[in-house]
């Protein structure tokens, strides 16, 4: 089964066109979207997430055709963007409590395990976290609600090589059972 299928998708802007893009991401795989800044990687991910509308083409996420996927399918997506997106006034512990309300399959024990594994202080305000720590928090959150498909948009850019390698190792662990998949956009070819 494919975790993600894009068939002939198009999105036109005044100064940019994503033109007839097709690809699939099978379960048990990591698919890389690579390109320079402005090449359409984030546009593609925003289309997959339903944040912007398609001009034409079809997208299927975990077997469900878009343009908007059901809450059940959305609950099976783990999304990590280049910014974690959690309020800086919160702590990692508070983020976990908030996400427990948002995801029916939230696994607090798994989340706490990732916080410990990554050395993330649960009571420290996120404003005091480094960029690498915030990215680790995003990965911990994405992996703690039984997501089937991880979507990472430039999630490794700006990270030091040790943190980047650690994150990439985690992605390899994530797909080992052939029941999960990853879509990773980057302009860093060594990430792929």
Regions found by a protein language model. Name each.
Residues 164-179:
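Helical segment within the ABC ATPase nucleotide-binding domain
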Residues 36-40:
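Walker A (P-loop) phosphate-binding loop of ABC-type ATPase nucleotide-binding domains
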Residues 57-68, 72-73:
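Conserved ABC transporter NBD signature motif
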Residues 150-154, 159, 184:
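Catalytic Walker B motif of ABC-type/P-loop ATPase nucleotide-binding domains
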